[in-house]
Amino acid sequence: MRKFGLLILFFSLFFASCQRQETMQELTDRVFERAAAQLALLDYNLDSAALAVPEQAIYPRSTNQDGSLWTSHYKWWGSGFYPGSLWYVYEYTGDVKFKNMALKYQVGLEPLKFRTDHHDIGFQLMCSYGNHFRLTGDTISRSVLIDGARSLATRFDPEVGCTRSWDFGKWTFPVIIDNMMNLELLLKAAELSNDRNLKNVALAHARTTMKNHFREDNSCFHLVDYDPQTGAVLKKQTHQGYADDSAWARGQA
């Protein structure tokens, strides 16, 4: 009986190994097909939400406990992710309806190009207008990127060598590791405008971050607070992570 059981196991494993595995292309096609369906459904639900609250700019954030959409104003730091996702699906599928959806949600983000009170405009604009420019060469998007980068650069302090992350809280000059994501906007705008100052700001921020955010084991702190008068490090800590001496996974990635 034991031999019979082992024989069944052997043949089960043998035939399982002979089954054709899904290729990477097939997997990618399947994932994008699913993503396209989900994003199209989200667009429909967002239209319904906008009708219910017409005075708000509607950007998807999450879901509430009752299953309804949790939406946010364009100033929310993740507002560029949805139009950015639509641009990626358009790029992969070539389906113009996703291009039109991306443009519909992207246009509400244009006022961000003149915001100087936070650092998130880097990926808010690069996800949306950055992908639009990359895929189409659109001149309006090009201008938005340059204006946005110059707004972001106003948060740079040459004594510290970084752009400031937040204007709230008990810190003096907080810089979070996530701020590295915003350097793409500075570098792209420097390339488009030949504005060397934007490139210098990006490189200085990267060098200062490399020097002060990383430990000997190459894990990183979430937040480093600086003295803007001297550039000295005041404190290294976390704000949203597990502990001050833990690694900030999102920044580490």
Write out the residue ranges for each language-model feature:
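Bacterial Sec-dependent N-terminal signal peptides
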Residues: 1-26
